[in-house]
A protein has these predicted regions:
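Transmembrane alpha-helical segments in multi-pass inner-membrane proteins
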Residues: 1-46
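Residues at helix-coil transition
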Residues: 4-8, 51, 222, 334-335
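Hydrophobic side chains within well-formed alpha-helices
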Residues: 10-11, 15, 38, 55, ...
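Short alpha-helical linear motifs
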Residues: 22, 37-43, 63-65, 220, ...
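Short helix-capping/hinge motifs at transmembrane helix termini and TM-loop junctions
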Residues: 28, 32, 51-52, 203
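Juxtamembrane/interfacial segments flanking transmembrane helices
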Residues: 51-61
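ABC-family P-loop ATPase nucleotide-binding domain
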Residues: 60-108, 337-339
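Glycine-rich phosphate-binding loops of nucleotide-dependent enzymes
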Residues: 96-103, 108-339
Length: 339
């Protein structure tokens, strides 16, 4: 019901409930009842694909378009000839001047008609921590899966250190120097903490011998504060320790670019503080980081720039404090009525 009416406003579910009730009441029995249920299903599919904000969202969108056109016309009348209206994507001034490490152009990904990512163009600069934020379902994890090679793009290019990696398999991305973590840690359950980290050194693109990989794994485990759990199995670790094991495994690949996908989810405030300090130390080692996270105090503390996605589209990028004050970003998180 909230899908049909819209979930961004309290009145949306009520609109959806009335529409569905009336439709089912009209088709009350026999074949008509089956037809009614089929029509409800078809309507919901159409709404999900073409009206993700629901009926109220569509009406609100029309109102915003009319208001924006009126505002733009008023500004045009008051402005000198030659004045141009700014682009809808916010590109704010930043002090980062390092050369680009990762460049994506027109990156898009669709799943059977559902557009998970649409024409995203951005760059990750060498040595920075770039925050990637947005509401649930905005395309953040899809972006991570694309630039780590786990998904192949529908359109667009992925260039890393000047080399076009578009369409290559995930192990080629790893060999190029891109590593990632997962929202839910995925260690090998039958291997110890030390063995899990050493495995990455042997087969994650470095090609080290078992002895060398084990020696280096010990240092990464110490970096993550897990040296006292080196011979424990993953099932014997708590969530905090499993998250840090995930970081140690990613670091064992010695990446140039590290993609962190919600490493703070499920952690306590004190554990989040430890994780923030660790991410800072990882950057201090010279690793560039893309930081996908919902914990905004961590995003504000760590990132040099942030990029905001919503419904698969890039809607803002720039300095964290400035971007979070943008009306489009507020609308993405809180709904248009609160923007």
């Amino acid at each position: 019901m909230s899908i049909l009416g819209g979930s961004r406003h309290w009145f949306g579910p009520a609109v959806g409930a009335v529409a569905i009730t009336c439709l089912l009441y009209y088709f009350t029995s026999g074949d008509s009842a089956v037809l009614g249920r089929a029509l409800v299903g078809l309507i919901l599919v159409v709404v999900i694909l073409f009206m993700p904000a629901g009926a109220l969202g569509l009406v609100s969108g029309w109102r915003h378009v009319r208001r924006n056109r009126a505002t733009a016309a008023a500004k045009a009348d008051a402005s000198p000839v030659g004045h141009t209206v700014s682009a809808p994507v916010v590109r704010l001034k930043t002090t980062i001047t390092a050369e680009p490490l990762l460049q994506v152009s027109g990156l898009s990904k669709s799943f059977r008609g559902v557009h998970a990512l649409s024409d995203v163009t951005l760059e990750v600069r060498k040595g920075e921590i770039l925050g990637l934020i947005g509401p649930n379902g905005s395309g953040k994890s899809t972006f991570i899966n694309l630039v780590s090679g786990h998904y192949k793009p529908t359109r667009g290019e992925i260039v890393f250190e000047g080399h076009n990696l578009t369409g290559l398999d995930a192990h080629r991305f790893a060999q190029a120097g891109i590593a990632r973590t997962y929202q839910i840690p995925r260690p090998f359950s039958h291997m110890t903490v030390l063995e899990n980290v050493a495995m990455v050194g042997m087969f994650g693109g470095q090609g080290k011998s078992r002895a060398e990989a084990t020696r280096d794994a010990q240092s990464f485990i110490e970096f993550a504060g897990l040296e006292h759990r080196a011979h424990a199995l993953p099932d014997d670790l708590n969530l905090h320790q499993r998250k840090f094991l995930e970081l140690a495994r990613a670091l064992a690949a010695q990446p140039k670019l590290l993609l962190l996908d919600e490493v703070l989810s499920g952690l306590t405030p004190s554990e989040i503080n430890e994780a923030i300090e660790m991410v800072q130390r990882i950057r201090d080692r010279g690793t560039t980081i893309v930081f996908v996270e919902h914990v905004m105090r961590a995003v504000m503390a760590l990132t040099d720039r942030i990029v905001v996605l919503n419904h698969g589209a890039l809607i803002a990028q720039g300095n964290a404090s400035d971007v979070m004050n943008e009306e489009g970003v507020k609308a993405a998180y809180l709904g248009k009525a609160h923007a």
